[in-house]
């Protein structure tokens, strides 16, 4: 008999029309992904993005060519090739250096990390004492200390900016709509990502809204009825985010460990992005995927607490971008597939997978708004904002755990980076609460007599 974990990752288990497990679904990312035969049977759309073959001209670059002039009839000995240039080890992590980048000898990994950190204005946090050891093995564990080490050894911000300035001429030449023409490969990528997003997250116009009067007029510490409903919807949304990830080209070609790392790191970011795209400023409300619409006070009482105003402010900042479903899907994919996440086994492979997503969003956004070239960088900046909100969300979860009467729902626990922080030393009940058959039935009445629930998350 198949376990709950196997059903989640079995082919078609999350397809259209399938039911959801209740809020007590005992799912853990490592158990569900690592070594799960049904998961391994899934065939990704693009498994192992192959490296393009080198042009034939490149094959001869390392060989000293001989003269083929018809005037030279006497063969001459070829000149010996110059000895390979040897660089000092990477000043940051002591790995093999590929040359001098931004002022110091560095490897490709640290070069790319420093460039991305400066170009995206990334703000990192050290979870220890800001004195982590950075070497080839530990460099991906603390981004804050790695960036500080880059500065300490002499990497230059200005060198990164100057590198970007060299491309200004090329950017200026991109004045005609033809410059934003998408290649067939990018068109296909955009189609797949957009479809994956739309089929795991219906847009606001597709929903039949309904409201509740529960604690709508005044803020309280926690409305347990609203919390139960929100945690149920959040659980469903996490399942949908897993499905979205599995449908992204190349994602299942990553190692199982890296898939787990990326999902756990970005799940809360994507959940926040999704709910914020369903913000209605006229009523100051947010709508979930079953149509439930809550005002700001109710969102506070449902469990957001002190995080509420920050989330609503972010939702308001998204409005001027006027992102469509395709752009939201691409931004979600970029947020998920990011080589800067800690503890990745193959960050360079993840970066390689992210590059076409960045290019697709850049060209799509520019083609959609020819007179607004700044929209693409503004969208990317929202990823930094999302990470900040997610950090505060994890902190809120710690205090929330003390306010709810039972254990934190397991999927929400697994979404957070340190699930052990939710372990209760008291005598709280251990078994996960069982969901009623009414909750599990697609389209059935909820346990609180609410409107029919389609199989969607927030």
From Swiss-Prot:
Domain remarks in the Swiss-Prot or TrEMBL record: Composed of three domains: a modulating N-terminal domain, a DNA-binding domain and a C-terminal ligand-binding domain.
PANTHER family linked: NUCLEAR HORMONE RECEPTOR, RETINOIC ACID RECEPTOR GAMMA
Annotated InterPro entries: NHR-like_dom_sf, NR_DBD_RAR, NR_LBD_RAR, Nucl_hrmn_rcpt_lig-bd, Nuclear_hrmn_rcpt, Retinoic_acid_rcpt, Znf_hrmn_rcpt, Znf_NHR/GATA
Stretches the record annotates as Modulating: 1-89
Zn-finger (NR C4-type) residues: 90-110, 126-150
Cited CDD domains: NR_DBD_RAR, NR_LBD_RAR
Chief place of localization: nucleus
Region (Disordered), start-end ranges: 58-83, 161-180, 409-458
Quaternary structure, from the entry: Homodimer. Heterodimer with a RXR molecule. Binds DNA preferentially as a RAR/RXR heterodimer. Forms a complex with PUS1 and the SRA1 RNA in the nucleus.
GO biological process per UniProt: anterior/posterior pattern specification; apoptotic process; bone development; bone morphogenesis; camera-type eye development; cell population proliferation; cellular response to leukemia inhibitory factor; cellular response to retinoic acid
DNA-binding region boundaries: 90-155
The protein's name in its UniProt record: Retinoic acid receptor gamma
Family to which the UniProt record says this protein belongs: Belongs to the nuclear hormone receptor family. NR1 subfamily.
Modified residues (Omega-N-methylarginine): 34
Compartments in which it is found: Nucleus; Cytoplasm
Gene3D superfamilies reported in the protein's UniProt record: Erythroid Transcription Factor GATA-1, subunit A, Retinoid X Receptor
Region of interest: Hinge: 156-184
Domain NR LBD: 185-419
SMART domains recorded: HOLI (SM00430), ZnF_C4 (SM00399)
UniProt note: phenotype after gene disruption: Rarg and Rarb double null mice exhibit growth retardation 3 weeks after birth. Defects are found in the growth plates with deficiency in cartilage. Growth retardation was noticable in limb sketal elements such as femurs. Early lethality and male sterility due to squamous metaplasia of the seminal vesicles and prostate are also observed. Isoform 2 mutants appear normal. The Rarg and Cyp26b1 double null mutation is able to partially rescue limb skeletal morphology without restoring normal expression of proximo-distal patterning genes.
GO terms under cellular component: chromatin; cytoplasm; nucleoplasm; nucleus; transcription regulator complex
Pfam family, one: Hormone_recep
Extent of Polar residues compositional bias: 62-71, 448-458
Protein function: Receptor for retinoic acid. Retinoic acid receptors bind as heterodimers to their target response elements in response to their ligands, all-trans or 9-cis retinoic acid, and regulate gene expression in various biological processes. The RAR/RXR heterodimers bind to the retinoic acid response elements (RARE) composed of tandem 5'-AGGTCA-3' sites known as DR1-DR5. In the absence of ligand, acts mainly as an activator of gene expression due to weak binding to corepressors. Required for limb bud development.
Keyword terms, alphabetized: Cytoplasm, DNA-binding, Isopeptide bond, Metal-binding, Methylation, Nucleus, Receptor, Transcription, Transcription regulation, Ubl conjugation, Zinc, Zinc-finger
Crosslink position(s): Glycyl lysine isopeptide (Lys-Gly) (interchain with G-Cter in SUMO2): 172, 401
